Amino acid sequence: MSVRVLVVDNYDSFVYTIAGYLAQLGAECDVRRNDAVEVADAAGFDGVLLSPGPGAPKEAGVCPDMVRHCAEARLPMLGVCLGHQVLGEVYGATVTHASELMHGKTSLVRHDGSGVLEGLPSPFTATRYHSLAVVAETVPGDLVISGRTEAATPGTGGVVMALRHRELPLHGVQFHPESVLTEGGHRLLANWLAVCGDAGAPERSHGMAPLVRR
């Protein structure tokens, strides 16, 4: 079953790579710029993806309202990087400057195997482009921290890398699944497409190669 995905482009240079991954997996994508889309435009779609982008969640235009709409409509939502931070902030978490600026750097991510992370190894390698991060201690009970960076010092936790809502189909990842250096990017997006209604997407993701921009 092919699903229709609304991709909210937060003026990010890699948004069409994400859309390309989704298309490889069989999804029909409609990419629209943040300032050219309204909450009502989500009608008729099976899921909404909030892309990475510059700035802070408070500057993310329609994205906070889109998260609220997806929650009310029980419409599957995936936030990537900035979109992930918006999800956290909408539910009351604090987003602040990360301890380290990450631009194209990789980290190991440990996770609980739930939601969009199902079937990925733990730890796996993820590529990060961000200077802000969700503060783990402020994440409310509505959300689950499903993935963190592997801490340099055992027992000290790690940077929040993935969130999911306990009851609603809302997910967020801080890292970039579309990066060629991220392990299991196709599988992660396929898991989300399964949430959107395409149960066969995870199986189709096996063996897919990353898209390399030229």
Model-derived features with residue positions:
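Cysteine-nucleophile active-site neighborhood
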Residues: 45-119, 123-125, 189-191
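Flexible gly/pro-rich beta->alpha loop and the following alpha-helix that scaffold active-site loops
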Residues: 2-8, 13-79, 91, 197
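Generic structural signal for residues in well-ordered beta-strands
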Residues: 29-31, 95, 145
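Short loop/edge segments at beta-strand edges and connector loops
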Residues: 33, 97, 128
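Histidine-centered divalent metal-coordination motifs
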Residues: 81, 130, 176
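Active-site-proximal beta-strand elements of phosphoester/diester hydrolases
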Residues: 126, 171-175
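Acyltransferase
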Residues: 180-214
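Catalytic beta-strand/loop cores that center a nucleophilic Ser/Cys/Thr
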Residues: 115-167
